[in-house]
Amino acid sequence: MIDRIFIPTVNRVNDQTTLSNIPKSLMDKVTLVVQSWERRKYKYDVDYLVLPKNINLDDYLCLSKSRKVIYEEGRNLKYCVLDDDLIFKRRNQKRFGLPSDMEKSSRNCTEKDTEEMFNLFDKWLDEKDVSFCGPSQIQNIPQTKLYSSNSSISSCVWFNGKNFNHILDDLPMVEVKYGEDVLFFLSLLSRGFGNRVSQLFCFGNESLKGKITSDVWDNSTFKDVWRDHKIIEKRFPQFFQILLDEK
C-alpha cells in the first residue's frame, strides 16, 4: 500500500476538503504540508511536514518549492500529492462498455470507492511502465477506455519515488509557478518515466468553482502566467504550445 499521502495547504485551516474525503483506513498515512507561520493553527490528528520559514506566501515560487520538498521527502516511497480542495468521483462504467452501475454519468466516491481507487493506483505503481498515475479531471470528456497512458495529469498524483530517485536532482522543480507540475511531468515523461490516468476515477477542484478562496492563485496576472508558460514552451515545444498572440 502507498506509504504517504501529502496534502500541501495554506490558509485553509477550516476548509480541508481533501482531508475530509480520505477514508479512515488511510488517515494514518496523511501528512499535511504547512508553512511554518501557521502550523499552530492546525489541530487535525495527522502527521505534519513543516516547510522552512523562507517558503511562504511572500515567495513567488512558494508552491514550486513546497512540492520540491515533498518530492525529496518521497525519494524512496510510494506516495501521492493531493491538492487540498478535491472531491473524488467515480464515472458510470457504462462509458467503458460495461453494465451501468449508477443512475447518472458520475457520482461522488463513497469511502469504499476511494479505498478501491487508492488500491488500484498502488498496484499500477508496481508496473514497470508506470512511475506516476492518478485520476482524470471530471470536467474533461472521458475516453471510452478505463485508462490512458502518458497523458495529462494534475492536482491529484501518485508517484513511485524510487523509480526516478536517481534523476530527481536533475529535474526542473523550481523554475516556474504557473504550470510547475506540467514542467515536472513532461520532464519525467521525456526521460521515459511513464504515467497512467484513470478514466473511471476522477476528481473535481472546489477552488475552480469559486467555492474556496486561494491565496496562491487569486492574485495571478497575465504577465506572470505568460512568462512561466513561455519557459515551458521553450523546453518542450513539441508538447507544449501557447496558442495565443501576446499582442
Language-model features: where?
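Active-site-proximal specificity loops/subdomain of glycosyltransferases
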Residues: 33-77, 82, 87-103
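A short acidic (Asp/Glu
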Residues: 16-19, 42-43, 90-93, 143-148, ...
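Short, solvent-exposed loop/turn segments at secondary-structure junctions
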Residues: 12, 38-39, 85-87, 138-141, ...
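A structural signal for short, well-ordered beta-strand segments and their strand-loop junctions
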Residues: 78-83, 131-136, 195-199, 241
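Short, well-formed alpha-helical segments that are part of the catalytic scaffolds
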Residues: 4-28, 34-43
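Conserved catalytic core of nucleotide-sugar-dependent glycosyltransferases
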Residues: 89-182, 190
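Structural alpha-beta junctions
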Residues: 24-32, 44-49, 123-131, 191-194, ...
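C-terminal catalytic/acceptor-binding lobe
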Residues: 3-4, 11-13, 174-247
